[in-house]
Every structure is written in C-alpha cells, then in structure tokens.
Amino acid sequence: MKNYYLALIVSALLTINIFAEEVEEVVVTSSLTKQTVSDLKDPLHVVDGDDVKAGGIQSLGETLDELLGVHTADFGAAVGQPVIRGMSGSRVRVLENGVVVRDVAALGPDHVNDINLLNSQQIEVVKGPSSLLYANGGAGGVINVVDNSIATTNITERVMSLGVETQSVNNGEAVDFSYENNISGFNV
C-alpha cells in the first residue's frame, strides 16, 4: 500500500511540472502596411497608388479587377463594386486608413464607394477568413485604401496633383486637389 501512495505522490508531482511548462499560443496582429508581403501568411495583395493614378480608373472594383480572385460587379459608369471570391456587399469590407467606410455603397450594389482613389498611396486587399482580423463581417475580404492624409514619414519633395473625372451617363463630376510639402519640419 505504501508503494501505491508513493507512486501516486510521484505521479502527481510530475503532472504538476508538466502543466507548469505549458504556454498558451499568442496571436499578434499588426498594421497591414508595416510588413513586406513576403513576410505575411495571409493572402495580401498590394496595389501601388501610382498604378491606380496612371490607369485613370474610376471605381474601386475596376481598380482591383486584375487581381486573382477579385472582379468587379459593374452597374454602370464608375459604379464597379469589388467582388472577392464570389462575395460582395456586406461580406466585403472597405476601409480607408484602417477605418471602416460607412457609406451608401453597403445599401445596394448600384451605389458607388465614397473613396478618393486619386489620393491613394496604396490599396491593400486581404482575402478569405483572415480578413476578420481587420474588420467584422467581412468574411469575403477586406480592402484598405491607404492615403497620405496623415504622413507617416517626412515629405522630402513638394508634390501637387490635380485630378478631374467626368461621367457622361449621369453627368457626374469629381475634382481632387492634393498638395504635399515639408515647411520648416512640418508636413503640409
């Protein structure tokens, strides 16, 4: 009987040590822009802002139409909604600088996203369930349009841009003016 109690005490002490050595898994998420694409496991695609401006594209869906697994649901001039892996509408979240855009585009497929593509620095697309780390309800994917409205680095050269867009179908017009400069250490 003494051997039984001794074995029970020794096994209890050994199991305490086993439980003390277990460590929980820690998941760390960060901003989409601080890592290179090759470092990420998530299916992240980045479209450079210069490519967007050079293409003269009018809608967010049309901009991303060339990416694998992404196409546009075209509802007329400048109303191309992004479709990621067959999901659109409320299943695809649109963010601007990491903040969910709440506009009338979520109400119906024929409403345009209120995103200024002419001022975009880059467009980040996360597809699939990993997009739930960045916005709720976006099981299809998340599109983050990053602009330089809050500069993260010092501006080294003066840049001035003007964009004008017209649409003949609905007599729509859009004008964008952007000016960037560093004056005495202050980004303007």
Per-region residue spans from a language model:
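Outer-membrane beta-barrel translocator/receptor signature
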Residues: 119-121, 132-188
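Short acidic/polar hinge/loop motifs at secondary-structure boundaries
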Residues: 100-127
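Transmembrane beta-barrel outer-membrane domains
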Residues: 75-77, 113, 168-172
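N-terminal periplasmic "start-of-domain" segments of outer-membrane beta-barrel proteins
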Residues: 25-53
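Extracytoplasmic
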Residues: 23-25, 39-42, 67, 79, ...
